[in-house]
Amino acid sequence: LSGDQALVYDCHLSPDRARLIRDTLAARGARRFNVILSHWHIDHVAGTEPFADCEIIANPRTLAHLTREKAALETGTYAGPPAISPLILPNRIFDDRLVLDLDGETVELLTFDIHSDDGTVLWLPKRGILLAGDTLEDCVTWVSEPEALPRHLPEIARLAGLGATAILPNHGAEDVIAKGGYGPGLISATSAYVTGLIAGTLSPDLATAIAEPVKAGDLRFFAAYQDVHSRNLAKVAEAKAAGLLT
């Protein structure tokens, strides 16, 4: 937020929560809103309706996924209720890199093939701040495209090349984010985890699998993610059995 302009990175889980975001920013003086979608997954696009009169920015893959699944998302049949109706599609499309100006501060939108093939991160180069969407997650990534994991590794390395000193993922420990975010160790921990998934070397026990980055302070252990880890291992095993991942 700067002056009367607000950049909104993702629009939350539901229209009512997105409306609260807009109302809160408006109460602080915002009159112009630009929404950036980090990727097409439901928990990031469900609140588009309150921003229907605004510029909604995404890359062409995000637009393609949302267009393909629009009917199912709006009827609540894609991944179950609630229905996202109406789903407002992006109306400004870019690829690779888009530079925005927020009252003199450079804001870069960059595309990455991590977690999903349509990732968009928000990078503030002057301050070293990276809004990572779901490209990074504490304490482990959610594998949605297991066959793409080998593509993700060089993309994670490219993400590290930005040199971010403060990383704000969409899913992470609230206290870490409130204190300014994660360090670059979150990226190396993600790379190590993806490498272990591909190689099949990770312990089925989450605490054991991520013991080193937790000890180093790069991750926070969260017991509920044991289910995510188990699901990731199963998804990778299924992809290997189907010949989609070697």
Predicted segments, located by residue:
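Conserved beta-strand hairpin/beta-sheet module of binuclear metal-dependent hydrolase folds
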Residues: 1-23, 27, 121-134
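Active-site neighborhood of phospho(di)ester-bond hydrolases with catalytic His/Asp-centered motifs
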Residues: 9-11, 33-41, 57-60, 112-113, ...
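Short, solvent-exposed loop/turn segments at secondary-structure boundaries
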Residues: 13, 70, 142-147, 178-182
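Active-site environment of divalent metal-dependent phosphoester hydrolases
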Residues: 14-16, 40-46, 63-66, 116-119, ...
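Active-site HxH/HxHxD metal-binding segment of metal-dependent hydrolases
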Residues: 18-19, 23-99, 192
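Core dinuclear metal-dependent hydrolase active-site scaffold
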Residues: 93-124, 129
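An active-site-proximal "capping" alpha-helix that borders the catalytic cofactor pocket
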Residues: 144-170
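Accessory terminal helices/loops
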Residues: 161-162, 174-246
